[in-house]
Every structure is written in C-alpha cells, then in structure tokens.
Amino acid sequence: MTPTWVNAPGRMVMATLSVPDISTAEGLYSDCLRYARVEAGRIEEPLARSWGAPAMAGKAYVLMAPREADTYALRLVETAPVADFAPMRTFGWGALELSVESVEAVHEAVKDTAFRIIGPPRDIMFGAPVRPMQVSGPAREVFFLTQVLEPEEGPETARAFVDQLFIAILATPDRGKALEFYERALGFKRGATFDMAYRSLNQAFGLAPDTQQSFTMLGSPVEGVIQVDQYPTGATARPLAPGHLPPAIGMVSFVVASLDAVRGEFFAAPARFGQAPYGGRRAAALKGAAGEWIELVEAR
C-alpha cells in the first residue's frame, strides 16, 4: 500500500542512487544511517524504458527508508561505475539533504566508514538555525545531513536517527534556465536566492573556503524541495554510460497531480507500474535543463 504522504502532489517521493555494489551500499545505509529495506527486486524492462535507460533492465534494486517511517527515501540500483566522475564537479543532481535528529550522533556513526566526511558539523543560519554536515558515499553520492535546531512541523523535522529526504540540490551551468524549466514544466515557484560561503562546493573546486556561491530555492505546491546551485567555472557535464542512469544521484522522483499537465518531453509515454512506490499509479521520466533525470509519479 502506498503511504498517504507519498500521494501529495509536489512531494519528493525518493532519490535513485546508481551504486556499483548494491549489497555494500545497503549495508552501509543500514549500519550508518539506520535505514531499512522496504522492497527489493530487479528493474523490469518497461520501467527501465520509461527512464530512457534500457540498459537498467534486469538490474538489482533495493528501496530503503527510515526504520521509524512508512515512506521512502532512497532507491539503490546496481550499475557499473563510471570512470572520471568526481562528486560535486558535474551538472545534474549534486547532493541530497536528509533531516537528522542529532548531527553529532550521525557524525560519530559515519566516521571511519566507507562514507567520507567532506564537511564536519557546524552551525549556520538558513532561514532558521541549522547544524549540517556533508559526506560522500562509495558511489560518490553526496549527502547533506542536517539537524534543524529549532524544529517546527514540516518535512525537515527529523523523527528518526536519519529521516526523510527534504531537499534535492541541483548543480547547473545556467541557474536561470533551470529555474525557468521547473516553473514551466512542473509549476514550481521560485523562492529566495542566497549568497554564502559554500564550504563543500568550494572544496570540490579548490577554491578559498570563504568564496561566495549563489543558489536559489524552488518550491513545489506544498514545500521547498529543490536548491538550484550555480556551479563555478570548471564544472562539466556528467559522464554517462549509454542506456544507463547517471552515476551517483541518478534521478529524483516527485509526485504530480496529473502527468497530462506536465509541459515537457518524456522519454516514453506514461505507464502504470505495480511495485513500490508506484502502487499502480502512472509514472514517466524526463530530462531537466541541467541534464538531470526527473521521474514524475501521479498522485492517484
């Protein structure tokens, strides 16, 4: 049964991670993030075709979620690694932000593991006081693990050791073009723009730690869900194996009220899929302005 939370238009359903060894990745997320398996199997050919990634057919997948929740957060899909791919250096989905109960406890859980800490915990003001840290995983996927210090009711409020995905960070060569795409195709609304010393991004590009970088928030009908980063000079298109999803953060899935209202070109015509998280609902995928893969699932 598909949880009610996943049915709300504008919500992020989950992110799909392309990982070279699914057993290793699942064990790491279970041990360090305390995520649990919801469902496992192999990608069926019609679903792979809907992603514009026919080579993904037959690949093993695992759907994972916080142990204390009945919703989804991550779908791991096993793929061959792509050479010459470095985290936070290419366009597309650059990072995922997950809410945590205690960033210090998470820091203890991930240190000296296959996660690489690229930014230790620190306090910042981002609308409200938060304490984030940043890590990269064995597939070179990047997570921002964020504790909200004055929590209110909302998707960023953690109710588990590591809880839900609440912001997807998009790396772009042209932020304005990316913002226009989501406004036109999905009806998302442009939010505030921020300039800040972006520690993890500056580190990836060898820039001084206090170098100012700029990003803009995008809001869906129900919440702010995408952070659109303008990437520095030197960023490149993400390398892609033919017929596969992009490496690391391969795709992010959102709920929409109707696929018929989407103003974009799908890889394949919308189709119904029975496995979680679709539950018989229609889904389709398309490519965004920065080369990112976007999956859309109808609310009903």
Where on the chain are the PLM-derived regions?
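Post-signal peptide N-terminal segment of secreted/secretory-pathway proteins
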Residues: 54-55, 61-63, 74, 82-90, ...
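Eukaryotic phosphotyrosine signaling hubs
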Residues: 12, 92-95, 165-166, 247-249
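Vicinal oxygen chelate
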Residues: 1-8, 14-17, 40-41, 72-77, ...
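Core segments of cupin and vicinal oxygen chelate
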Residues: 17-70, 123-126, 171-223
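A short, acidic/glycine-rich surface segment
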Residues: 45-50, 81-85, 151-155, 199-203, ...
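Glycine/small-residue-rich hydrophobic helix-like segments
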Residues: 217-219, 231-234, 239-240, 245
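Short glycine-biased active-site loop of nucleotidyltransferases that positions the nucleotide triphosphate
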Residues: 52-56, 86-88, 134, 158-159, ...
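Extended intrinsically disordered, low-complexity coil regions enriched in Ser, Thr, Gly, Ala
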Residues: 23-43, 84-93, 105-116, 176-196, ...
